[in-house]
Amino acid sequence: MKRTSGFARRAAVGAAAALSLLAAGCGATTTGGEAEGGDSSVEEGFRVGLLLPESKTARYEKFDKPYFEEALTDLCPECELSYQNADQESSKQQSQAEAMLTEGIDVLVLDAVDSEAAAQIVNQAKGQGVPVVAYDRLAEGGVDYYVSFDNHRVGEVQGEALLQALEEEGTADDGQIVMINGSPTDPNAADFKAGAHQILDGQVEIGAEYDTPDWSPDRAQTQMDQAITSVGADEIVGVYSANDGMAAGVIAALKSAGVDELPPVTGQDAEIAGIQRVIAGEQYMTVYKAIRPEARTAAEMAVAAATGEEYDGGEAGLTEVEDGGGNMIPSVLIDPVAVTEENIEDTVVSDGFYTIEEICTDAYADTDFCTEAG
């Protein structure tokens, strides 16, 4: 099935004109069919809108935007990118989307602040013939494509790592863990939470659990303060934190409570600060999600959708994911990787995500990792 966008319709009109010229003796041909993930580029440019959700998490401005822009330039050198960040405000993202649609974008790549609220954006885009690619978070409303990571597996990876740490320390039966989950408006957070519970339930006692609006590190710190009061600092043997930013808040709360030997704390996103906490022994692990292939896939989907082609998923292949409205969305899901001190060099360093110099700043130069890395 081909998907017809406004740009694709204009391209079809151009193709019809070219065929008329061909009948008059001018040589012109058109091609169409199924778009494969790869290195082929589109000659005619169009306008692509990219909406990212927030800037508190370092990845979006540092990696997602530049990686997407790099891939789009490679796939469609003449394309024009319109970009906005919503700063975790759903209403702001709505206004940004409306402005882009008014400007005349031909395809929208949307990382929703609030998946349910984003259905309005999706419906407005569809009403104007503009296809929508859901990026990292699945917006409701029946988007054309979705690319993310296997989010249930992310939670499993975090839960498995936390259990492993507790088993290594022999503390799994000696106390309780605290769970600091992500934002209740982010469907990914629900998947992380479900995956973690699948691993942790029945294996450890969960003394306190919180959902954290806006993925706020400050809110996470407050929640951890509450958990320390209700559970007791000495009873907390581990903390499931859904991402690195909140892990920073968790660790700050533990330190403020006078906890000298920090329990294992999980994270996600492989932020540079998270990696540095791992090598400093403050955070047990993080989850590395290879953003470059995610951004590349989103760009491939956007180009295919805007030109009326059907994206085949490339090497990863397509699966289907059901959104909140029961729509089955063609999707690419990328596998996450657990990162501890032992495999930092084999993951984020070998992939070029960070260099040793970026990780081993003066404050961390004396850690075992940096000493061994030279």
Predicted regions and their residues:
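A residue-level marker of the well-folded mature domains of exported/periplasmic proteins
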Residues: 2-10, 24-374
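Bacterial N-terminal signal peptides
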Residues: 14-24
